[in-house]
Amino acid sequence: MLRKFKGISPDVDPKAHVFESADVIGMVKMKEFASVWPNCTVRGDVNRIEIGRYSNIQDNSCLHVADRYACIVGDYVTVGHCATLHACTVEDHVLIGMGSVVLDGCVVGTGSVIAAGAVVTKGTIVEPIP
């Protein structure tokens, strides 16, 4: 469900899809063919969230922000079930494994894979895969 926060509504491309049981709140931009699956929370309350083209946020995942950091998800990204992305940047063609947590200020480089259940601690830079 799309929800306003402080008068700001999510901006969802007509070709993107949000399941009814998901909550997409506030300053969120979803590009074409992006999808947010059941029971996810994507909450752009104090900063913005962007979900790139063809990226999918799978069941029970949470995307959130911090005052200092937005949450940016590039193109062709898969965020596995029950993952948490908090105030981080995930570049293009990345797989975020099920149940993993990526914390504030992290940058996950293009082509990287974050293992299921991993915790990527605050400020970590995961180098791109050439």
Where are these regions (language model features)?
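Structural signal for interior beta-strand "rungs" in well-ordered beta-sheet cores
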Residues: 5-7, 11-130
